[in-house]
Amino acid sequence: MTAAPDTPSDPLDLAEPGLKWGNSFARLGPGFYTELQPTPLPSPYWVGRSQALARELGLEDHWLESAEALEVLTGNRSTAGSRPLASVYSGHQFGVWAGQLGDGRAILLGDLQTPAGPQEIQLKGAGRTPYSRMGDGRAVLRSSIREFLASEAMHGLGIPTTRALCVTGSDAPVRREDIETAAVVTRTSPSFIRFGHFEHFSYSNQHDRLKTLADYVIDGFYPACREAKQPYAALLEAASERTARLMAAWQAIGFCHGVMNTDNMSILGLTIDYGPFQFLDAFDPGHICNHSDPQGRYAYNKQPNIAYWNLFCLGQALLPLIEDQEQALAALESYKTVFPQALEARMRDKLGLVETQAGDRELIESTFKLLASNKVDYTIFWRRLCGFTPQSGHESVRDLFFDRESFNAWALQYSERVAGVDQGVRANLMLKSNPKFVLRNHLGEEAIRAAKLKDFSGVNTLLGLLQAPFDEHPGHDSFSDFPPDWASSIEISCSS
């Protein structure tokens, strides 16, 4: 069954002429969601706005600065043509079947027709839904700023991700471990469908709806799968390949997600749901960024295997449609092929290895081992390495290591490998592959502390740096420096 195309709706009165709301997800039918209005956010104010994303969506810059936009993007005002809803899904959380979950505080307004195609607009923190369970449906300022900045930072790094148009705040109190204040993040994505959506309809034996959902995803996002002999196996294979490339991007940049439950896995291979994430400071393969994960299920070095485990769950959910277990397992094999290839390609770029040679994999592995044994700052190492030449003394890189003998041995190996490479070409490749700026925990924490005092300059400064993280940004070197000692005491959990 193919989802019916959207019928024209009234023009969106707050966008450029010709842009219209639709809601293709709503056409799946009421068994997939509950329609409801957002809960108004009292006395909202702007915290941060991505004008770059607004332009991509076809919105005028001045609109995102308007009082009207503030009301719409906090859920305080409805707009013609939008059809707010919360979707239902299930999932495995920390490896255990959690049953029915769903959008407990996120409300989809609809999809906006943009120059790049439809983009769903979702308000996170917009109030209780039938899927809130014991939650209050709100998000807090702290976690909302982190998600806003991380979404745009990952996009700036070229890593597939949902986006964030803005974050708005309110003085309305919200109880977590302490009393905090409410906020709403406006998220955008071609689709917010997760592995957990498929699990929900499969494990509740709603196989007709499972097929409807799979057909919707194939026809909307994986049309080439429709031509396959077994379209649903092809969908599993395509999702596996996208997820493999995403994991390669995470590992190469030093990103820890923190809570890779199946309901936090995008069917489109996007990074989604920024909670207790972290970009690595000192390189530690076993780093655990989530204080709520004491066993380290989602540690940095376990992410690739967890992604495969989650894909296996997706394969099980799709089995009623694929009907052949061996075919499903064969579709999953693409992950095992694509991930190491994609990771090696990214690491070659980071090392400036313009052409592939035998021994590159061994050089990559020795680099990781050297960084781990010396606990070297991951981002700073790679950025400084951009200036490494076989003829130089490499002092700025060597200074990062306490085991100078091991570094010297590695530097000799690396120098021999890049000796025949054009240094200008190599440096250019490396400068585009190794960012100067990432969203370190302490930078986010400083911006959050200021924002709690109604000073949003830190949020806006960070946003500008993170949207162009490979640029030098003169005068902002402090944002690319080593983290302060107190940064190691920051604890990030699932609380948001």
From Swiss-Prot:
Names of required cofactors: Mg(2+); Mn(2+)
Chain residues that bind Mg(2+): N264, D273
Lineage of source species: Bacteria, Pseudomonadati, Pseudomonadota, Betaproteobacteria, Burkholderiales
EC number: 2.7.7.-, 2.7.7.108
Protein name: Protein nucleotidyltransferase YdiU
Superkingdom assignment: Bacteria
Naturally occurring in which organism (per UniProt): Polaromonas sp. (strain JS666 / ATCC BAA-500)
Reaction(s) catalysed (UniProt annotation): L-seryl-[protein] + ATP = 3-O-(5'-adenylyl)-L-seryl-[protein] + diphosphate; L-threonyl-[protein] + ATP = 3-O-(5'-adenylyl)-L-threonyl-[protein] + diphosphate; L-tyrosyl-[protein] + ATP = O-(5'-adenylyl)-L-tyrosyl-[protein] + diphosphate; L-histidyl-[protein] + UTP = N(tele)-(5'-uridylyl)-L-histidyl-[protein] + diphosphate
TM helices/strands, residue ranges: none
Active site (UniProt): D263 (proton acceptor)
Binding site for ATP: G102, G104, R105, K124, D136, G137, R187, R194, D273
Family: Belongs to the SELO family.
Keywords: ATP-binding, Magnesium, Manganese, Metal-binding, Nucleotide-binding, Nucleotidyltransferase, Transferase
Coiled coil, from the record: none
GO MF entries: AMPylase activity; ATP binding; magnesium ion binding
